[in-house]
Amino acid sequence: MEVSEERDLYLHSITAALERLNSAASECQSRLLSEHDGSIEDHSANQTAHDNLVQEAYKFLQIAQGPIDTVATCFERTAHVACARSLLEMGAFEGLPIGGESRSTKELAEDLSVDEALLARLMRNSALFEETGPNQYRHTPFSEAYLRPEIRAMFRFAMDEHMPAHLKMHEFLKSNSWTEPTSTSNNPYTYAHDTNGKSMWEYLSERPTRMASFNDGMTLQAMTELWMIDLFPWESLSDQQPTPTTVVAVDIGGGTGMGISRIRSYCCSLPGKFILQDQAHVIQSADPRGNGIEKMAYDFFEEQPIRGALTYLIRRCLHNWPQESIIQILKNVAAAMQPEKSRLLIEEIIVPDMNAGIEEGWMDMIMMNLGAKQRTLKEWEEVLALAGFEVRKIYQIPGNCHGLLEVWLK
């Protein structure tokens, strides 16, 4: 290709990408400036506009950089996260004052008892702090995010557990004859961490500090995705005429209770019981809010003790497991359900058949580390059928990858 042709192609590509970026930015700005009613549809429209803007920004940056520089960004991105993880461990984020005041690396290094030259290099190359003078830094909103406990935990978990698995993924897949990993004990994570045949869950259970990072980080996900509970018309359960002894909802693997508390608030006029189930160490710290909510230690690989509930829920759990394990979990629920009375609600990402978004993509690679996966609707229907279920309704906002599957016994 001639130089002039290459230049013209680049100019055309970057102009078109800029137009798409400006359009996405205008739509996002319009959503931000409009009045909001707090509905699920409103929330989803805001999120979709934001996601589209981010995606177009990524595309624009890729075109602006060109193919070779885009490949080279792997050095830049890994350097940034390496700096951030080191600064987190060092305690540098807490060492800077909040409120816009800057501080020298000399003062900060003395407080932290670290080498100033090392600290200065890490802060300079982290792309997080504002440089106000030679070796003078202050917080930005991006660095202050690391002061939030749930953000710190999520980042630590990503870097310490999944980054090694990502970097060793090609080695594992080659040793696995380039086939999809489907085992909890033989996957990129167990390979990278040399777990000696233990799954990530078993391995982390022996390392409480690292398991705590996972649990604390998941509270962020639980808070940001609570809105999916709102997709189901909870008031419709009154049609089944529950009594004070009826179990209205069982939240299986429901964590600390935010989900079941929200469900109870939507069913405030209904009598009956609401059950929060999770492993014993999680249930101990659970604090659900609402009348009639009971806590129960339970492992979903065991027989489900609550029989004939109106609604069972499994929220954001099944994607962590390979198909064989999912079928076992689902069959335990199925055995407890009463035909044409009990339903199971499954809250998960539903990967679109085409043009999957950023979140679905990186989440699927996280799951590959564990021998699990994110699934399309067809794939969910297939695995559910193997456990004796059929999908009767899908609750999903257009443009959003998260959905709620309402499934019944076949």
Curated annotation (Swiss-Prot):
Q: Give me the residues that bind S-adenosyl-L-methionine, please.
A: G253, G254, D278, D299, F300, R315
- Alphabetical UniProt keywords: Methyltransferase, S-adenosyl-L-methionine, Transferase
Which Pfam families would you find in this protein's record?
A: Methyltransf_2 (PF00891)
Is Methyltransferase among this UniProt entry's keywords?
A: yes
Q: How does a null allele present? A: Fails to produce aflavarin.
Gene3D superfamilies from the UniProt entry: Vaccinia Virus protein VP39, Winged helix-like DNA-binding domain superfamily/Winged helix DNA-binding domain
- Give the top-level enzyme category: transferase
Q: Where is the signal peptide?
A: none
Which pathway, per its entry? Secondary metabolite biosynthesis
Q: Does the keyword Methyltransferase apply?
A: yes
The Gene Ontology biological process annotation of the record reads: methylation; secondary metabolite biosynthetic process
Family membership noted in the UniProt record: Belongs to the class I-like SAM-binding methyltransferase superfamily. Cation-independent O-methyltransferase family. COMT subfamily.
Please explain the role this protein plays, according to its UniProt record.
O-methyltransferase; part of the gene cluster that mediates the biosynthesis of aflavarin, a bicoumarin that exhibits anti-insectan activity against the fungivorous beetle C.hemipterus.
Protein name per the record = O-methyltransferase afvC
Q: What is the protein's species of origin?
A: Aspergillus flavus (strain ATCC 200026 / FGSC A1120 / IAM 13836 / NRRL 3357 / JCM 12722 / SRRC 167)
Q: What is the lineage of its organism?
A: Eukaryota, Fungi, Dikarya, Ascomycota, Pezizomycotina
| Gene coding for it | afvC
